[in-house]
Curated annotation (Swiss-Prot):
It is found in: Cytoplasm. This is Transcription-repair-coupling factor. GO terms for biological process: regulation of DNA-templated transcription; transcription-coupled nucleotide-excision repair, DNA damage recognition. GO terms for molecular function: ATP binding; damaged DNA binding; DNA helicase activity; hydrolase activity. The lineage of its organism: Bacteria, Bacillati, Bacillota, Bacilli, Bacillales. Keywords: ATP-binding, Cytoplasm, DNA damage, DNA repair, DNA-binding, Helicase, Hydrolase, Nucleotide-binding. Coiled coil: none annotated. One of its GO terms (cellular component) is cytoplasm. Its EC number is 3.6.4.-. Gene3D superfamilies: 2.40.10.170, 3.40.50.11140, 3.40.50.11180, P-loop containing nucleotide triphosphate hydrolases (3.40.50.300), Penicillin-binding protein 1b domain (3.30.2060.10), Transcription-repair-coupling factor, D7 domain (3.90.1150.50). It holds the Pfam family MFD_D3. It is an enzyme of class 3 (hydrolase). The gene is mfd.
């Protein structure tokens, strides 16, 4: 974008602006948003000061940020995102926005140069005093001395929580001389101390808990918007007590008890740990002199204001909203007199003392003394939308008028394509700038702005893809923490005390922890399991592979088995029979597929390439991969049967559309089968819009079509006139004949009935089939399904998705009203989820009284199909503002304009349901809001409480997400294998079921488990060899290390585990050293065919297998073991060698030496 700033910099108009910008009060009029951004960015580039850009709301701030990222390095661009919503302070919010706010405040506190975008309510928000924030900025360097207690205390003040193992943002832990911290910004950090001196600082991976790179120094930012020290707490106690005493007599007697509960709920008097998320509601009482963000800026900062009049309007409504919100919470006993979240001074008063530059599109009167007014003439660019003739004549006009023409396109490919297009129009163009650009020609560069603009006085026009082809702007990515779904799902298998487990031989029990027991004078660790009644089982940790966490559907509580009974054997036999039947079916399908002959497509045509380039968005890597996989399938002679898995709105439709286009280009017909009329309509509209410039005949068959239209479509399918037909189960009726069906696309197959599924099967015969589903399919099942059905997965969301802002809060009509008004004021729509059909109409009346001007509709499952569809369609077409609905909206409907979801009694829903419902909003480039309400002061059941806790962590990083993924995975497994299997999965747990299914499939396919060359080794030594609690206190970590030791087969793995132990827990004690020695002995034994090493008191018995005995070179062995002298005796028993070793001092070292010698004496067999 340098070309653009160069042209602007040289212009006289800009130079006039530049002289007064930041020097005196100035009004700049006439500039469109993108032109304004270009000027502001250039001013910033030329100055050495901080620049503050104030907008009226967060939505506007986001839009300007996207454009500014084209000119300014992301490292220097900061935003202070505060939602335009009071309720925010009362709910648990996602860490994304908070980490952006903290990044901004930290940069300001450090006096960094930057361009800072702040919406009005961010400007007015009460904050921690600047000096206190500055005192809590910590930079740690290797070699420095630190006071550990003081340091940990500071972390707590900054909002960090102490845990035994760090796994989430905002946690820290202390183990021996190792401090782990997971800050909101940057990588998790591990600090190793030598006494009080910092010995090393390393990044570490929270999933593996292993260190990565060493760093010399690190900044530790706060984990909360507010710093809360002991002094703050004592000030807060006094202030809150006074506020409580002031408020109590002034409110209605009926709510005084509620006020008392609210007062006590802050636990200021009995707790030593304070939850920052809750205490920030009391910010008005926290500090003697709170700051606003303006106090964080340098005294010479430059201030730019975007649309003053809009800001004043927002300020008015913000003040009214804030007043009414505070009155409501005081009247209902949820708040105190004096409580506030924003400074009530006028916006102008806040920025007093700074020279301000006001940008306004139109000339306007302002109650401000202005020193300068600068007027620009700026015109919008004609929207061409691909109309070649208009484009040519407009470009010709620019050339004739000697304009500098800057064309912005988003990818390198499009640069070439655009240049070819302009050369056809005889418009001179260049793509690289060698010297300064001459007027009367176009320069085509990679870049993107939200819109183009024309500045006639400068002789400059900027044209973007939006005007050229109607495409949407690609949202710039800022730094985000990437977390793969595999990692998200991994940790649900962590064992916590109280979890249900499945023991392969004993069935379902409960995990009670790891216990160290003394058996025959030696200490060992055992896993303690509780079974039915008082039965308990202690499983040695080296047999822990027989124990798995019980994972099943969310609401499924398994019953415990009895130890020693036959019940578990029967259950397992039943499941075994069922998986064998499925394996049989799968294998038949597999054989059938391998033998089938289908149509083999050729490589992509030129039309296909053009069609794909027309897609206005950038493909995500997963989409691109899925498309390649599908095309590869189509280009083989074997018919395709592929399942495409991807969350709602992750772009499965575009993948399907490209496959459909490929089929049509080779003269084949496509049938697109969907479960509901509305979905059919939506897919039909998408296809029409995507293929409008190509000769493709698309028809719809659903209840929205007249009998006459349906008849014509049937005729067209028969003659081949219709290329693509989209429809509901009507497509499955017997009287439909295709001339040449090549591709069948089925959306959400599991939602069709049994009869329809049978019919789909017959349609599938020798035709390529692509099935789409939004329910994730578990990876473990992918394995056993491989070769039976191919699978593509889309796990990355499209670029311009904002994460849905999730709030969990108590049910309160003033919160609800605010949320509804907020969405309707931005012309959006609301889903109001109320799951009680009997009183759903009363709920609608209640909302109507709250929002008299809103159009409110009701949708529930007891309505006739037709009524329901018509209501939904009217809602999609924007005829209603609010839809009060049951969970019927959980699946499939796409309403991009509905971006607020309110769920009453969220504690009654399953997490996976909430996760899917939340996917209904945030489907466009606007921020989506989800409010999960739970009844006030209601005693929640334990599960509901856990569930709400999990929902609170429901942002991408939370465990709630993992549980939802787990439950959906199980649902996906049920869909894939049939309903009755769901029950079997619940009886034995998901992992054991998957394992049994995989074994059965492999057996049927004749794939034998590779029989281990070496038999299992039993090592039994009377030694204290375990992981003491003093060394590793966290049980999950302990189990994890034991699992690794159990799976160790090489010396590299042993070295790796030793490194990990020192890295995570510091130097290990003698018991751990012995444990590692035993594992080392076991590895030697594995490699040399030893089957048993047994401690018999004074001697150690060693047995080799017959095969190992044949392979051993006796001469080499005797020579090598001479140092052992007479302590070693060799014998033969049943053709197998036995060795006894007499125990002496340092016998463990002798044993290690002996097994190493045995391994080195093995002859390498010929096959190797």
């Amino acid at each position: 974008m340098t070309i653009l700033t160069t042209l602007i910099k040289e212009d006289n108009h800009f130079q006039d602006l530049n002289q007064v910008f930041g020097q005196a009060n100035t009004l700049v009029t006439g500039l469109s948003p993108s032109a304004k951004v270009t000027m502001i960015a250039e001013k910033y580039a030329q100055s050495n000061q901080q620049l503050l850009l104030i907008t009226n709301n967060l939505y506007q701030a986001d839009k300007l940020e996207t454009d500014l990222l084209q000119f300014i390095d992301a490292e220097e661009l900061y935003k202070y995102p505060v939602q335009d919503i009071m309720t925010e302070e009362f709910s648990t919010q996602s860490p994304q926005l908070m980490s952006e706010r903290i990044r901004t405040l930290t940069a300001l506190a450090q006096g960094k140069k930057g361009l800072f975008i702040v919406p009005l309510n961010g400007l007015k928000k009460w904050l921690t005093p600047v000096e206190m924030w500055q005192n809590h900025q910590m930079t740690l360097r290797v070699g420095e001395d630190i006071d550990v207690d003081q340091f940990l205390n500071k972390l707590v003040n900054m909002g960090y929580k102490r845990e035994s193992v760090v796994s989430h943002i905002g946690e820290f832990s202390l183990r021996g001389g190792i401090i782990d911290i997971f800050p909101l910004i940057g990588e998790p950090i591990r600090i190793e101390l030598f006494d009080t001196k910092i010995d090393s600082i390393r990044d570490f991976d929270v999933e593996t808990q292993r260190s990565k790179d060493n760093v010399e120094e690190v900044d530790i930012t706060t984990a909360s918007d507010y710093i809360i020290t002991e002094e703050v707490i004592s000030h807060l106690k006094e202030e809150l007590k006074t506020a409580y005493e002031n408020t109590r007599p002034k409110i209605d007697k009926s709510v005084r008890n509620d006020l008392k509960e609210t007062y006590e709920s802050f636990k200021l008097f009995e707790s030593t740990y304070f939850d920052h998320q809750i205490l920030r509601r009391l910010v008005a009482f926290m500090y003697e002199t709170p700051s606003t963000i303006i106090e964080y800026f340098q005294k010479d900062a430059i201030i730019a204001v975007d649309e003053f009049n809009r800001i004043k309007e927002t300020e008015e409504s913000l003040t009214v909203e804030s007043d009414s919100f505070i009155s409501n919470i005081i009247e209902s006993g949820n708040g105190f007199i004096g409580q506030s979240f924003i400074k009530y001074d006028d916006f102008e008063t806040l920025i007093e003392g700074y020279p301000v530059t006001y940008f306004s599109l139109f000339a306007t009167t302002m109650p401000i003394k202005l020193n300068h007014i600068i007027k620009f003439s700026c015109k919008p660019v004609q929207q061409f939308y691909g109309q070649y003739d208009i484009m040519r004549s407009e470009f010709q006009r620019y050339v004739n008028q000697n304009y500098h023409i800057v064309v912005l396109v988003e990818t390198e490919t499009k640069v070439e394509r655009m240049q070819a297009m302009l050369s056809e129009m005889h418009i001179p163009s260049i793509t690289k700038l060698h010297r300064s650009m001459s007027s009367g020609q176009a320069v085509i560069i990679e870049g993107s702005l939200s819109e183009g603009f024309e500045l006639p006085d400068m002789g400059l026009v900027v044209i973007t893809e939006r005007e050229l082809f109607k495409s949407k702007q690609k949202k710039q990515r800022k730094r985000t923490k990437a977390i793969s779904n595999a990692e998200k799902i991994k940790s649900y298998q962590d064992l916590n005390v109280g979890d249900y487990i499945v023991h392969v031989h004993h069935g379902v029990g409960r995990y009670l922890g790891v216990e160290t027991l003394e058996v025959g004078q030696t200490h060992r660790d055992y896993i303690k399991l509780q079974y039915k009644g008082t039965d308990q089982l202690f499983v040695p940790v080296d047999q822990m592979d027989q124990v798995q966490k019980y994972v099943a559907s969310e609401d499924k509580t398994p019953k415990l088995n009895k130890l020693g009974g036959s019940e578990w054997k029967k259950t397992k036999a039943k499941v075994q029979q069922s998986v064998e039947d499925i394996a049989e079916e799968l294998i038949d399908l597999y054989k059938e597929r391998e033998m089938a002959e289908g149509y083999q497509y050729g490589e992509d045509t030129a039309e296909q390439t053009t069609f794909e380039l027309d897609f206005p968005y950038e493909l995500t890597p997963d989409q691109a991969k899925s498309i390649d996989e599908i095309k590869d399938d189509m280009q083989k002679s074997r018919p395709m049967d592929r399942l495409l898995c991807g969350d709602v709105g992750y772009g499965k439709t575009e993948v399907a559309v490209r496959a459909a286009f490929k089929a049509v280009m080779e003269g084949k017909q496509v049938a697109f089968l969907v479960p509901t009329t509305i979905l059919a309509q939506q897919h039909y509209e998408t296809l029409i819009e995507r293929m409008q410039d190509f000769p493709v005949e698309i028809q719809l068959m659903s209840r929205f079509r007249t009998p006459k239209e349906i008849k014509q479509t049937k005729e067209g399918l028969k003659t081949g006139f219709v290329d693509i037909v989209v429809g509901t189960h009507k497509l499955l009726s017997k009287d439909i004949q295709y001339k040449d069906l090549g591709l069948l696309i089925v959306d959400e197959e599991q939602r069709f009935g049994v009869r329809h599924k049978e019919r789909i099967k017959t349609l599938k015969h020798n035709v390529d089939v692509l099935t789409l589903t939004a329910t994730p399919i578990p990876r473990t099942l992918h394995m056993s399904m491989l070769g039976v059905r191919d699978l593509s997965v889309i796990e990355t969301p499209p670029e311009n998705r904002f994460p849905v802002q999730t709030y969990v809060l108590e049910q309160n009509m003033s919160f609800i009203k605010e949320a509804l008004e907020r969405e309707l004021s931005r012309d959006g729509q609301v889903f109001y989820l109320y799951n009680k059909v009997q009183s759903i109409y009363e709920k609608r009346e209640q909302l109507q009284m709250l929002m008299p001007d809103a159009n409110i509709a009701v949708a529930h499952g007891q309505m006739t199909e037709r009524d329901l569809e018509e209501t939904m369609l009217s809602f999609i077409n924007n005829e209603y503002d609010i839809l009060v609905t049951t969970t019927i909206i959980e699946t499939g409907v796409d309403v991009p304009n509905a971006n607020t979801l309110i769920i009453e009694d969220a504690d009654r829903f399953g997490l996976s349901q909430l996760y899917q419902l939340r996917g209904r909003v945030g489907r466009s480039s606007r921020i989506g809001y989800a409010y999960f309400l739970h009844p006030a002061n209601k005693v929640l059941t334990e599960t509901a409480e856990d569930r709400l806790q999990a929902i609170k962590e429901f942002t991408e990083l939370g465990s709630g997400f993992k549980i939802a993924m787990r439950d959906l995975n199980i649902r996906g497994a049920g869909n894939l294998l049939g309903k009755q299997q769901h029950g079997f999965i619940d009886t034995v747990g998901f992992d054991l079921y998957s394992q049994m299914l995989e074994e059965a499939v492999n057996e049927k396919r004749g794939i034998k488990e590779p029989e281990s060359e070496v038999p299992e080794v039993e090592v039994d030594l009377n030694l204290d060899a375990y992981l003491p609690t003093e060394y590793i206190a966290n049980e999950q970590a302990k189990i994890e290390i034991y699992k690794k030791l159990r799976k160790t087969e090489t010396f590299d793995q042993i070295i790796d585990i030793k490194d990990e132990l020192i890295d995570r827990f510091n130097d290990y004690p003698v018991e751990v050293a012995r444990l590692l020695d035993i594992v080392e002995i076991k590895v030697h034994a594995l490699h040399s065919g030893i089957t048993l090493i047994k401690d018999k008191g004074k001697i150690i018995d060693i047995h080799l297998s017959v095969k190992a005995t044949e392979n051993i070179d006796g001469e080499v062995l005797f020579k090598a073991t001479q140092p052992l002298g007479r302590t070693m005796k060799v014998g033969v028993q049943n053709n197998a060698m036995t060795i006894t070793l007499t125990k002496q001092n340092q016998w463990l070292d002798s044993l290690k030496f002996l097994v190493k010698c045995i391994e080195e004496s093995m002859r390498i067999s010929d096959e190797a």
